[in-house]
Every structure is written in structure tokens, then in C-alpha cells.
Regions:
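Short helix-initiation/N-cap motifs at beta->coil->alpha
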Residues: 42-53, 106, 144-181, 286, ...
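Short, glycine-/small- and polar/acidic-enriched structural segments
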Residues: 23-142, 146-155
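Secondary-structure end/capping motifs
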Residues: 235, 241-318
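Short hairpin/turn module used for nucleic-acid contact or packing/dimerization
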Residues: 307-338
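Hydrophobic/proline-rich hinge and linker segments of small-molecule sensing/allosteric domains
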Residues: 17, 90-106, 229-242
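Immediate post-signal peptide segment of exported/extracytoplasmic ligand-binding proteins
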Residues: 3-16, 105-115, 292-294
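Pocket-lining segment of extracytoplasmic ligand-binding domains
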Residues: 157-267
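Extracytoplasmic "Venus flytrap"
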Residues: 15-25
Length: 338
């Protein structure tokens, strides 16, 4: 493609942008907040369809992307994008450990040697879940008999080629199978679920969470580590960022303003006399979150998140994804390292 270049005083730089429809991205997506010097053509895509496009064909100039996939690409010197520290998706993951009720798994160490399903071995949720098991509970996740594939329906496979050591057992499930079905049939002992498993929501007695009081465990994890698990960042096409070095900061500022608008709206609802959200205990949740994490609980920027990013880079190498230990500074455009 031709390298697009302009200055902020010249004609506008046309950019395609894609991400999921987060409240914190809405003002950029709908044009309420402009990116100075740019004309944005925004598209909304679920990450299940967007991430293969980002990795496979780099379709968009600016895109939401998986942090685990990105770390792996940086370690290999691959990929079309350079990141800015806009973390559109963050999620605590203790809630996603789902086990068979009869598998004899009462604590994390009991997972060793078990048959464990995960949609993709390299996905960011799995990176975090393995990292938590290793750091907090001393679990050797290399002993797991990993099965990969669709969580509940459809098909899924790792979007990146992995070079795993021979002692690792990572096997795709068959076409037409799902991890949930295998768990319910007793062919898996546990599943790492990046979303609430349908069988769990339905109250199927064959499955349960490893951490029944997961909210308390997740709050304790944050209190101990300071981490609010980063899932996704924003990537800018390298050729465009190189030709327009002002652009990463302009995008960062726009997404930060968009997040601030979303946070202000949440606060106005919290402080209002009528609850505008269809969520009965929103006020309690908001107060608990602020008490634990402070008023700026969805942080962007490099410095405030460096320790967390360093843990992710360490885990990526330890889990046989990245061939080398990546420094967090190497993940982001140079204008973002502050």
C-alpha cells in the first residue's frame, strides 16, 4: 500500500479504524471526539472476527488487537502494527476457571496433569490464567493436556503459528466438537472460559467454578498485585506511524478523552437519583470498585501499566509463546514511552 503522510496543518489523513463497541471508545467511533489531522472511517467488529483480520491481513490502519498475539509478534520481529497504550479491554480472569464437579479439582494445584480446554493456547485470557496459576499457586501448566477449539459452537484455531516444545501436549479438538460439550461429556476436566460458559449460567450440576467466590478472589488479587488484567491494545500501522510520528500521540489523546467521557457518564449515573442502568446493584459495585482501585480505575498510558506489561512479557516467554523476553518498552511507539 502507499504510505500515507501529512502534517496536522495539511489536508486530513484518511484512516480506517476498527474496534469493538466499548463505551470507552464510543466517542471516537461516532466522531464526537475527532483525531486532530485525521479523517476516521470507523467500523465496529467483535474481536472474534477482528483479530484474525489484524493478524492475517492487517486490514485496518488503526485496530484493536490481542496483547498476547502482539507480544509474540514483537518477539519474532513480525506484525504490521505498533501499539499505543490504550487498553480498550481489561478483565479479571479468576471467574473463567470452570471445572467438572466430579473431577476432584478442589484447588489450583489439582489441575496439574488434567485435561484442560482453551479456545486458543496463545489467547490473552489464557496467558493471564496460566500466569496467575503459576505466580499465585505454583501450578505447572506445562503438565496440562491442552485441547484447543471452539468454546461452545462454531470453529476456532490458534491464529498464530506456535513453536511449542515437545514435552507440551496441545491438541485441537475435532471439527463439530466444542470444549463445553467435551467438558459435559467428561472428556475434559476443566475449561479456561473467556466468557461465562452457557452450561454454568444454566446451572448444569456437572460443572462449577474453581473459585466459587471469584469476585472476592479477583479483588484480593488486585489488592496484592495492583493488576487489572490487560487484554487488548490499539495498534497503528507501522508505515503510517513512521511517516506521521505525531499520529500515535493524537490517537492516544483522542481515545483517552473518549474513555474520560465514558467514565464521567458512569459517575453521573452513580450520583444520580434514578439508576439509568438496568443493573440493580450498580451503586454498590461502583463504590466497591472506587474504594479498591481509585476513581481512575481504567488506566491508559505506559508508566502506570509497566509492571503489568512486564509480567505479561515474562509469562509469554515462560509459556513457550515468545521466543525471547520482550521489554515492555519495545511494545509501544517511542512517543508513548513516558
Amino acid at each position: 500500500m502507499d504510505i500515507m503522510t501529512t502534517s496536522k496543518t495539511d489536508t486530513l489523513l484518511d484512516l480506517s479504524l476498527a474496534c469493538w463497541d466499548y463505551d470507552r471508545a464510543q466517542a471516537v467511533l461516532d466522531g464526537t471526539i475527532a483525531v486532530p489531522g485525521c479523517r476516521i472511517a470507523a467500523e465496529v467488529h467483535p474481536t472474534s472476527t477482528l483479530f484474525p483480520l489484524a493478524v492475517g491481513e492487517a486490514r485496518f490502519d488503526v485496530t484493536e488487537m490481542s496483547m498476547s498475539s502482539y507480544i509474540l509478534q514483537v518477539a519474532k520481529g513480525e506484525g504490521a502494527y505498533v501499539a499505543i497504550p490504550v487498553f480498550l479491554s481489561r478483565a479479571f480472569r479468576h471467574n473463567g476457571f470452570v471445572v467438572r464437579a466430579d473431577a476432584g479439582i478442589e484447588n489450583p494445584k489439582d489441575l496439574e496433569g488434567k485435561r484442560v480446554g482453551v479456545p486458543e493456547y496463545q489467547m490473552t485470557a489464557a496467558l493471564w490464567m496460566r500466569g496467575i496459576l503459576a505466580d499465585e499457586y505454583g501450578v505447572d501448566t506445562d503438565t496440562f493436556q491442552w485441547r484447543t477449539g471452539a468454546l461452545e459452537e462454531g470453529t476456532r484455531k490458534d491464529r498464530l503459528t506456535l513453536d511449542l516444545p515437545p514435552h507440551m501436549s496441545v491438541t485441537p479438538i475435532e471439527a463439530g466438537e466444542s470444549l463445553q460439550d467435551l467438558l459435559l461429556a467428561g472428556e475434559l476436566d476443566a475449561v479456561f472460559a473467556p466468557k461465562p460458559l452457557n452450561a454454568l449460567v444454566a446451572g448444569d450440576p456437572r460443572v462449577r467454578r474453581l473459585f466459587p467466590d471469584f469476585a472476592a478472589v479477583e479483588r484480593a488479587y488486585h489488592a496484592k498485585t495492583g493488576f487489572f488484567p490487560i487484554m487488548h491494545a490499539i495498534g497503528v500501522r507501522k508505515t503510517i506511524a513512521e511517516a506521521n510520528p505525531w499520529l500515535p500521540k493524537a490517537l492516544f489523546d483522542a481515545f483517552t478523552q473518549s474513555r474520560d467521557r465514558a467514565m464521567a457518564k458512569l459517575e453521573s449515573i452513580w450520583r444520580g437519583s434514578a439508576n439509568r442502568l438496568t443493573l440493580p446493584f450498580f451503586h454498590a459495585e461502583m463504590e466497591e470498585t472506587r474504594a479498591l482501585m481509585g476513581p481512575d480505575f481504567w488506566t491508559y498510558g505506559f508508566a502506570a501499566n509497566r509492571a503489568e506489561l512486564d509480567a505479561m512479557c515474562r509469562w509469554s516467554q515462560a509459556q513457550h509463546l515468545a521466543p525471547r523476553r520482550v521489554a515492555p518498552e519495545d511494545l509501544f511507539h517511542e512517543s508513548m514511552i513516558a
